[in-house]
Amino acid sequence: MAREPQRLRRRERKNISSGVAHVNATFNNTMITITDAQGNAIAWSSAGMMGFKGSRKSTPYAAQVCAEDAGKKAAEHGVRTLEVEVKGPGAGRESALRALQAVGFHITSIRDVTPIPHNGVRPAKRRRV
């Protein structure tokens, strides 16, 4: 018996004018999620999703390509203005922000939401290379 082909469900196009761009820039990767005001994800991308592997994921260029991809997906849903929340110490922080501006979004605010410990857990030992 032949199996019937699976139907691809096309996501319905939301009509959202403003959103929040969450930029998570770690030392190893850059992940960007664009959500609505309630936190429901509209579009997302990461340097690894864009085909960068290994140490290339942590470059500013990878973050730029990733931000352009997420921005284009969000623009299809009608997003025009963005608040940007940047988290982490990675190299892709500023380049992702510039790429979102270059896509054509009006950025209303930029917040740094990097978690800072109040002397939490012991840090990892120093690397000896």
Curated annotation (Swiss-Prot):
Gene3D superfamilies: Ribosomal protein S11. The keyword Cell cycle does not apply. One of its GO terms (biological process) is translation. Signal peptide: none annotated. PROSITE patterns: RIBOSOMAL_S11 (PS00054). One of its GO terms (cellular component) is ribosome. GO terms for molecular function: rRNA binding; structural constituent of ribosome. Pfam families: Ribosomal_S11. Keywords: Ribonucleoprotein, Ribosomal protein, RNA-binding, rRNA-binding. InterPro entries: Ribosomal_uS11, Ribosomal_uS11_bac-type, Ribosomal_uS11_CS, Ribosomal_uS11_sf. Located on the platform of the 30S subunit, it bridges several disparate RNA helices of the 16S rRNA. Forms part of the Shine-Dalgarno cleft in the 70S ribosome. Part of the 30S ribosomal subunit. Interacts with proteins S7 and S18. Binds to IF-3. Belongs to the universal ribosomal protein uS11 family. This is Small ribosomal subunit protein uS11.
